[in-house]
């Protein structure tokens, strides 16, 4: 069973300066796929083998998983995958901002820790500031992929993403949930869930050309939907 960590604890609030692509990848100018909450990184390691012309970066808040995952990444054949420890909501914005234009071309959040209770809203991985940082880094047409096996986990992510108005579903993919994974390698969790014949809820978005809302405005509108009683008192 996956052990949760509280991202709001003081230890995880310390910002970390993540290395630039030049220090991470053998060919640093290749397009980057960023996987937020990559666990042991098995999906990314498989993608790196299949897609050597992409660089793949996973970030994970559980340090014991990162130690072994990045050891495997460093041993990969193509030098195009790394797994780093950080709190995505604290350390990723500056790293994405420093990238070359259109270097980040895909972001995925797959099976995040299920902080689905409303009082734990601020522990969820996809927060307004992080979503807008992703939207800033992605050029129009670039992808954001979300999936979970817990409906109460993915629905708030979908609500937040669509409230931002920065992303659209592909024209050919207007169904509520995608039937298939657009990535060619499933995560460990996805394999387990599908083996149990349980549902997986997936949504693929592409960055549109809309301007970004302010973080405070997006936070307020998200709170009004996700926790109306709290919104009335703030």
From Swiss-Prot:
UniProt keywords, alphabetically: Methyltransferase, S-adenosyl-L-methionine, Transferase, tRNA processing
Gene Ontology molecular function, alphabetical: tRNA (guanine(46)-N7)-methyltransferase activity
Binding site for S-adenosyl-L-methionine: 35, 60, 87, 113
GO CC terms: tRNA methyltransferase complex
Catalysed reactions listed for this entry: guanosine(46) in tRNA + S-adenosyl-L-methionine = N(7)-methylguanosine(46) in tRNA + S-adenosyl-L-homocysteine
PROSITE patterns membership: SAM_MT_TRMB
Annotated catalytic residues: 113
Metabolic or biological pathway, per its Swiss-Prot or TrEMBL entry: tRNA modification; N(7)-methylguanine-tRNA biosynthesis
Name the record gives this protein: tRNA (guanine-N(7)-)-methyltransferase
Source species: Synechococcus sp. (strain CC9605)
Gene of this entry: trmB
